Design a protein with these regions (language model features):
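Sec-dependent N-terminal signal peptides
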Residues: 2-16
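Boundary at the C-terminal end of the N-terminal hydrophobic targeting segment
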Residues: 18-20
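Helical hinge/lid and interdomain linker segments adjacent to catalytic or ligand-binding clefts
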Residues: 23, 27-33, 64-73, 116-164
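N-terminal, post-signal-peptide region of Sec/Tat-exported proteins
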Residues: 35-74
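Histidine/cysteine-enriched polar flanking segments
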Residues: 37, 88-97, 153-163
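Short amphipathic alpha-helices in soluble, non-transmembrane regions
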Residues: 71-84
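Non-catalytic propeptide/linker segments at domain boundaries
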Residues: 81-111
Length: 164
Protein backbone atom coordinates (compact mmCIF):
# COMPACT_ATOMS: atom_id res chain seq x y z
CA UNK A 1 0.00 0.00 0.00
CA UNK A 2 2.82 2.40 0.92
CA UNK A 3 4.50 1.63 -2.41
CA UNK A 4 1.36 2.61 -4.31
CA UNK A 5 1.06 5.87 -2.40
CA UNK A 6 4.71 6.69 -3.00
CA UNK A 7 4.41 5.79 -6.68
CA UNK A 8 1.35 7.99 -7.23
CA UNK A 9 2.89 10.81 -5.21
CA UNK A 10 5.99 10.63 -7.40
CA UNK A 11 3.89 10.66 -10.59
CA UNK A 12 1.81 13.58 -9.30
CA UNK A 13 4.85 15.65 -8.30
CA UNK A 14 6.57 14.92 -11.61
CA UNK A 15 3.48 16.03 -13.51
CA UNK A 16 3.24 19.25 -11.51
CA UNK A 17 6.91 20.11 -11.95
CA UNK A 18 6.79 19.53 -15.71
CA UNK A 19 3.59 21.43 -16.43
CA UNK A 20 3.62 23.98 -19.21
CA UNK A 21 4.40 27.44 -17.96
CA UNK A 22 5.95 29.18 -20.95
CA UNK A 23 5.56 29.59 -24.68
CA UNK A 24 8.67 29.94 -26.81
CA UNK A 25 8.35 31.73 -30.13
CA UNK A 26 11.43 30.42 -31.94
CA UNK A 27 12.87 32.88 -34.44
CA UNK A 28 15.42 30.66 -36.18
CA UNK A 29 14.92 30.01 -39.87
CA UNK A 30 13.99 26.34 -39.51
CA UNK A 31 11.48 26.54 -36.65
CA UNK A 32 9.43 29.70 -37.27
CA UNK A 33 6.95 29.69 -40.14
CA UNK A 34 5.96 33.36 -39.81
CA UNK A 35 8.68 35.59 -38.37
CA UNK A 36 6.93 38.92 -38.85
CA UNK A 37 3.71 37.74 -37.24
CA UNK A 38 5.78 36.43 -34.29
CA UNK A 39 6.87 40.01 -33.60
CA UNK A 40 3.21 40.97 -33.77
CA UNK A 41 2.27 38.27 -31.25
CA UNK A 42 4.89 39.59 -28.85
CA UNK A 43 3.57 43.14 -29.25
CA UNK A 44 0.01 41.84 -28.76
CA UNK A 45 1.07 40.14 -25.50
CA UNK A 46 2.74 43.30 -24.21
CA UNK A 47 -0.37 45.27 -25.11
CA UNK A 48 -2.41 42.83 -22.97
CA UNK A 49 -0.06 43.43 -20.02
CA UNK A 50 1.81 40.14 -20.29
CA UNK A 51 5.57 40.33 -19.82
CA UNK A 52 7.85 38.83 -22.45
CA UNK A 53 11.54 38.05 -22.65
CA UNK A 54 13.53 38.62 -25.81
CA UNK A 55 16.22 35.95 -25.92
CA UNK A 56 18.92 37.73 -27.90
CA UNK A 57 21.09 35.37 -30.01
CA UNK A 58 19.14 32.34 -28.79
CA UNK A 59 17.60 30.55 -31.77
CA UNK A 60 17.45 33.69 -33.88
CA UNK A 61 16.32 36.02 -31.09
CA UNK A 62 13.37 34.01 -29.81
CA UNK A 63 10.65 35.33 -27.51
CA UNK A 64 9.60 33.73 -24.23
CA UNK A 65 6.00 34.35 -23.19
CA UNK A 66 3.86 33.09 -20.31
CA UNK A 67 1.70 30.11 -21.18
CA UNK A 68 -1.91 31.22 -21.58
CA UNK A 69 -4.71 29.76 -23.67
CA UNK A 70 -5.39 33.09 -25.39
CA UNK A 71 -1.73 33.39 -26.45
CA UNK A 72 -1.72 29.86 -27.88
CA UNK A 73 -4.97 30.59 -29.72
CA UNK A 74 -3.63 33.87 -31.14
CA UNK A 75 -0.47 32.10 -32.35
CA UNK A 76 -2.62 29.52 -34.12
CA UNK A 77 -4.85 32.19 -35.69
CA UNK A 78 -1.85 34.14 -37.00
CA UNK A 79 0.10 31.09 -38.12
CA UNK A 80 2.98 31.60 -35.69
CA UNK A 81 5.05 28.59 -34.65
CA UNK A 82 5.41 28.11 -30.91
CA UNK A 83 6.73 25.57 -28.45
CA UNK A 84 5.26 24.92 -25.02
CA UNK A 85 7.92 24.74 -22.30
CA UNK A 86 7.89 23.46 -18.74
CA UNK A 87 9.49 25.39 -15.90
CA UNK A 88 12.55 23.14 -16.05
CA UNK A 89 12.96 23.68 -19.82
CA UNK A 90 12.72 27.44 -19.33
CA UNK A 91 15.34 27.28 -16.57
CA UNK A 92 17.67 25.26 -18.80
CA UNK A 93 17.36 27.83 -21.60
CA UNK A 94 17.95 30.79 -19.25
CA UNK A 95 20.96 29.03 -17.72
CA UNK A 96 22.40 28.47 -21.19
CA UNK A 97 21.84 32.13 -22.09
CA UNK A 98 23.44 33.40 -18.86
CA UNK A 99 26.57 31.28 -19.30
CA UNK A 100 29.68 33.48 -19.62
CA UNK A 101 30.78 31.38 -22.59
CA UNK A 102 27.70 32.40 -24.59
CA UNK A 103 27.07 35.65 -26.45
CA UNK A 104 23.40 35.72 -25.45
CA UNK A 105 21.15 37.82 -23.27
CA UNK A 106 17.59 37.74 -21.97
CA UNK A 107 15.89 41.14 -22.09
CA UNK A 108 12.58 41.56 -20.25
CA UNK A 109 9.94 43.48 -22.20
CA UNK A 110 7.22 45.01 -20.04
CA UNK A 111 5.31 47.52 -22.14
CA UNK A 112 4.10 47.77 -25.73
CA UNK A 113 5.79 50.87 -27.16
CA UNK A 114 3.76 53.54 -28.90
CA UNK A 115 5.30 53.61 -32.38
CA UNK A 116 5.52 56.42 -34.91
CA UNK A 117 6.87 56.11 -38.44
CA UNK A 118 8.19 59.21 -40.19
CA UNK A 119 6.52 58.98 -43.59
CA UNK A 120 4.60 61.37 -45.85
CA UNK A 121 0.82 61.50 -45.48
CA UNK A 122 -1.33 59.57 -47.91
CA UNK A 123 1.11 56.73 -48.55
CA UNK A 124 -0.25 53.20 -48.64
CA UNK A 125 1.39 50.55 -46.42
CA UNK A 126 2.95 48.86 -49.46
CA UNK A 127 4.63 52.14 -50.52
CA UNK A 128 7.06 51.88 -47.63
CA UNK A 129 8.87 48.76 -46.37
CA UNK A 130 8.57 49.69 -42.68
CA UNK A 131 4.85 50.42 -42.77
CA UNK A 132 4.31 47.28 -44.85
CA UNK A 133 6.09 45.12 -42.26
CA UNK A 134 4.34 46.71 -39.28
CA UNK A 135 0.95 46.39 -40.97
CA UNK A 136 1.56 42.74 -41.87
CA UNK A 137 2.83 41.97 -38.34
CA UNK A 138 -0.30 43.66 -36.93
CA UNK A 139 1.77 46.08 -34.87
CA UNK A 140 -0.06 49.42 -34.53
CA UNK A 141 1.79 52.60 -35.47
CA UNK A 142 1.06 56.22 -36.26
CA UNK A 143 2.42 57.80 -39.43
CA UNK A 144 3.85 61.23 -38.69
CA UNK A 145 5.56 63.79 -40.87
CA UNK A 146 6.93 67.31 -40.71
CA UNK A 147 3.78 68.90 -39.25
CA UNK A 148 3.77 66.58 -36.23
CA UNK A 149 7.50 67.01 -35.68
CA UNK A 150 7.20 70.81 -35.79
CA UNK A 151 4.21 70.63 -33.44
CA UNK A 152 6.45 68.86 -30.87
CA UNK A 153 4.43 65.62 -31.00
CA UNK A 154 7.46 63.32 -30.85
CA UNK A 155 7.04 63.29 -27.08
CA UNK A 156 3.88 61.23 -27.54
CA UNK A 157 5.81 58.21 -28.84
CA UNK A 158 8.18 55.66 -27.33
CA UNK A 159 9.72 54.67 -30.63
CA UNK A 160 10.23 56.71 -33.79
CA UNK A 161 11.31 55.00 -36.98
CA UNK A 162 13.19 57.27 -39.38
CA UNK A 163 14.16 56.20 -42.87
CA UNK A 164 17.81 56.26 -43.76
Amino acid sequence: MIRKILFFTFIFLTAISSRASFILLPMDETSQQNHLKAYGITYWCLNKNYKASWLLNYRGGSFLLPDAAEIRKECQIRGVSFEVLSDSEETTILNEISSPSQNMESVVLEKAPKIAVYTPKGKQPWDDAVTLVLTYAEIPFTPIYDEEVLADQLLLYDWLHLHH
